[in-house]
C-alpha cells in the first residue's frame, strides 16, 4: 500500500469499497478494490482469496488489467486493477439519453466482449456475472470485462449449478434447476447487447415472479428497426431459450457480420504489441488444432474443440487472435430444423466441455432407425440415469488446470448479493417452466428428452402490478407431469395469486410493514447482511421500485417460505 496514493472513493458495496489510487513511481491511475474479511463467513473469505488468485492469472487485452494484490492485516483483500476512464456500460447507456449507439460501435464492443469470454471459456472459467455494470470502457471506448467475484473454475467432472448472479441477467436453465456451463455467459451477454441496443433491459418486471416468467418464456420486445437484420438476428440468437441452440463465443466470432471488426481488432493488437501476427505454420504449432465441423458430424462447444495435448492453465492460453479464422461461418438462423441429440455422460464420466450440452446435429437419419435423444443431466438431487448414452465417446476435456487447479470455487460473491440464499417462488406448475420431462418410450429402456410445448405468449394477463391472472390448465398438460408435485405446486402458487394488495388499506400496509420488520430482524440475527441489503435497498433515495412492492414482496417471502432461513 505504501506504493500507492489514495485519491478518492469511487464505489462502495456490501463487502468492501473501490478507491481511485495513483502509483507513486509510475504516476499512473489504478483502482484499489478492498474486500472486507472481518465478520464474514468462511465461504465469503475463501471467495475473496479466490478472486485475488484468479484475476492474477488472467491475461487478456479485453479483461481488466491486473496490477497487484495483497492481504492487509488479515482484515482486507486488496486487489489493484487498471482504471477505466470511460466508466461502465450502465453509465454510458444512461448518458446516451435515448440516442442509440451506432451499429458499428456495437459490433466493435460485441467482438471485444466475445474475445474476452472465448479466452475465459477456453480456460474453463465461467464469469457468471456478465452485466452492463461489469463492462468497463477505456478513454478510447474499448471494452474491459471486470468483476470476477462470482467466477467459477470448472473441473473435468464439474458443472455449475448454484443460483448466483444478477436476476435480470440469469439464463432459463439456471432458473429451471439445470446444471449450466459457458452458454449461461452467452445468455447474459445477449441481455447486455439487447440493453446496449434498445437502451432498456431485456427482461424487466414488477416482482421476482414476473421476471422469472418472462425469462422462462424468453419474451423480449423487438430491437429498433434502424439496425440491420443480421445484427438483430445475432443478438436474438444469444437469447435462445434452449442452450443447445445458443451459439458459443467462437461461433459468434466467425459470423460474416463480425469478421471486419475482428480483423480491425487483430490489426490494432498487432500494432500495440509492436509485432506482426505469426504465420499460419507458427499459429498451428502454438495453439492446438480444432476439429473441423461439417454437416452431420459431432459439434462441441467451448474448450472441448481443442486437442488432447492442450495444457489447461490460464497462463498457457495463447492470445485470442491465433485461432479465430479456422472454420466456416455457422448458420445462426432460427429456422434450423436439424435434429438435436443430447449426449448424456455417466455421473462419474468426464464432461466434454464447460458447457452443459453437447448436441449432435444430423441432416439425415441413420439407416434402419431414427435417432433418439438421451436424458438431459440434472442436478444430483434429481433422478438421473446411471447408464451413459450409447455411442458416447471419451471427452477431449482435460482435467488439470495447472495453477488454477489448486483453487476452490465457492459459489458466493464477494461483491454481489447472494441470490441463492433468497428464497423466492419459482414459476408455478401451470406456467410451464423450462424443465425437461423424462418419459419412457415403449420398447425402449432408455429415457428420452421431450421438451415441453411452448406456452402462448398471452396466456397470462396482468390485471394490475400486484395481481396476476391464473392460467388455465388442460388435461393434456396434467397427463405429462407428476400429479403429486403438480398439486403441491398449484396449492402454493394459487395461494399467492389470490392475495391482493391494496395500497390504500392501512391495515394491509401495517401488516406488510410488520412482516418486513420481522423478516429483517431475523436476517440481522443470523448475520445475513447480503440478503438484508437486497431487502432494504428499494427504500433508499432515488430508487425506482415503489415501497409498496418491496413491502409486499417481503411479506410474500415470509408467507411462502417460513422455514427458508436455515444455513446452506
Swiss-Prot record:
This protein's encoding gene: NEK3
Superkingdom of this protein's organism: Eukaryota
Region annotation Disordered: where it falls in the sequence: 277-312, 440-505
Role: May be involved in plant development processes.
UniProt keyword NADP, yes or no: no
Pfam families: Pkinase
Protein family: Belongs to the protein kinase superfamily. NEK Ser/Thr protein kinase family. NIMA subfamily.
PANTHER family: SERINE/THREONINE-PROTEIN KINASE NEK (PTHR43671), SERINE_THREONINE-PROTEIN KINASE NEK1-RELATED (PTHR43671:SF45)
Binding site for ATP: 10-18, 33
Reactions that this protein is recorded to catalyse: L-seryl-[protein] + ATP = O-phospho-L-seryl-[protein] + ADP + H(+); L-threonyl-[protein] + ATP = O-phospho-L-threonyl-[protein] + ADP + H(+)
UniProt name for this protein: Serine/threonine-protein kinase Nek3
Enzyme Commission number(s) of this protein: 2.7.11.1
Amino acid at each position: 500500500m505504501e506504493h500507492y496514493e489514495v485519491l478518492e472513493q469511487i464505489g462502495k458495496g456490501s463487502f468492501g469499497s473501490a478507491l481511485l489510487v495513483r502509483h507513486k513511481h509510475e504516476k499512473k491511475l489504478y483502482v484499489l478494490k478492498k474486500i472486507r474479511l472481518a465478520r464474514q463467513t468462511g465461504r465469503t473469505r475463501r471467495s475473496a482469496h479466490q478472486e485475488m488468485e484468479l484475476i492474477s492469472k488472467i491475461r487478456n487485452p479485453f479483461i481488466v488489467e491486473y496490477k497487484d494484490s495483497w492481504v492487509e492485516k488479515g482484515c482486507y483483500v486488496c486487489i489493484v486493477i487498471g482504471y477505466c476512464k470511460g466508466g461502465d456500460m450502465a453509465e454510458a447507456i444512461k448518458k446516451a439519453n435515448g440516442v442509440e449507439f451506432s451499429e458499428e460501435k456495437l459490433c466493435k464492443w460485441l467482438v471485444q466482449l466475445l474475445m474476452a469470454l472465448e479466452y475465459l471459456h477456453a480456460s474453463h472459467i465461467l464469469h457468471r456475472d456478465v452485466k452492463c455494470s461489469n463492462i468497463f470502457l477505456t478513454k478510447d471506448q474499448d471494452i474491459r470485462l471486470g468483476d470476477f467475484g462470482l467466477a467459477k473454475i470448472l473441473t473435468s467432472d464439474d458443472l455449475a449449478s448454484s443460483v448466483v448472479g444478477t436476476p435480470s441477467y440469469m439464463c432459463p436453465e439456471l432458473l429451471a434447476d439445470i446444471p449450466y456451463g459457458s452458454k449461461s455467459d452467452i445468455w447474459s451477454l445477449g441481455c447486455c447487447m439487447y440493453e446496449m441496443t434498445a437502451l432498456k433491459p431485456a427482461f424487466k418486471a414488477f416482482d421476482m415472479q414476473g421476471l422469472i416468467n418472462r425469462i422462462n418464456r424468453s419474451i423480449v420486445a423487438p430491437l429498433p428497426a434502424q439496425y440491420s437484420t443480421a445484427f438483430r438476428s445475432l443478438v436474438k440468437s444469444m437469447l435462445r431459450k434452449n442452450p443447445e441452440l445458443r451459439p458459443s463465443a467462437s461461433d459468434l466470432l466467425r459470423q460474416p457480420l463480425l469478421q471486419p471488426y475482428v480483423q480491425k481488432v487483430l490489426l490494432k493488437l498487432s500494432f500495440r504489441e509492436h509485432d506482426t501476427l505469426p504465420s499460419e505454420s507458427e499459429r498451428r504449432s502454438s495453439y492446438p488444432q480444432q476439429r473441423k465441423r461439417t454437416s452431420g458430424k459431432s459439434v462441441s462447444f467451448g474448450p472441448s474443440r481443442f486437442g488432447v495435448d492442450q495444457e489447461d492453465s490460464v497462463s498457457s492460453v495463447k492470445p485470442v487472435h491465433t485461432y479465430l479464422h479456422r472454420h466456416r461461418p455457422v448458420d445462426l438462423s432460427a429456422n434450423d430444423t436439424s435434429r438435436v441429440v443430447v449426449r448424456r455422460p455417466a455421473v462419474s464420466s468426464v464432461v466434454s466441455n464447460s458447457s452443459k450440452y453437447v448436441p449432435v446435429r444430423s441432416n439425415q437419419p441413420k439407416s434402419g432407425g431414427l435417432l433418439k435423444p438421451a436424458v438431459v443431466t440434472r442436478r444430483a438431487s434429481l433422478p438421473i440415469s446411471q447408464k451413459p448414452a450409447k455411442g458416447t465417446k471419451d471427452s477431449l476435456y482435460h482435467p488439470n488446470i495447472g495453477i488454477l487447479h489448486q483453487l476452490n470455487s465457492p459459489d458466493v460473491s464477494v461483491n454481489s448479493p447472494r441470490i441463492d440464499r433468497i428464497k423466492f417462488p419459482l414459476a408455478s406448475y401451470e406456467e410451464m417452466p423450462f424443465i425437461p420431462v423424462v418419459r419412457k418410450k415403449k420398447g425402449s429402456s432408455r429415457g428420452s428428452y421431450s421438451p415441453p410445448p411452448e406456452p402462448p405468449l398471452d396466456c397470462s394477463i396482468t390485471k394490475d402490478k400486484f395481481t396476476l391472472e391464473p392460467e388455465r390448465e388442460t388435461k393434456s398438460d396434467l397427463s405429462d407431469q407428476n400429479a403429486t408435485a403438480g398439486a403441491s405446486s398449484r396449492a402454493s402458487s394459487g395461494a399467492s395469486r389470490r392475495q391482493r394488495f391494496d395500497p390504500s388499506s392501512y391495515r394491509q400496509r401495517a401488516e406488510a410493514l410488520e412482516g418486513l420488520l420481522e423478516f429483517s430482524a431475523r436476517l440481522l440475527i443470523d448475520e445475513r447482511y447480503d440478503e438484508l441489503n437486497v431487502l432494504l435497498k428499494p427504500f433508499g433515495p432515488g430508487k425506482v421500485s415503489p415501497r409498496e412492492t418491496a413491502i409486499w414482496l417481503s411479506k410474500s417471502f415470509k408467507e411462502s417460505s417460513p422455514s427458508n432461513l436455515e444455513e446452506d
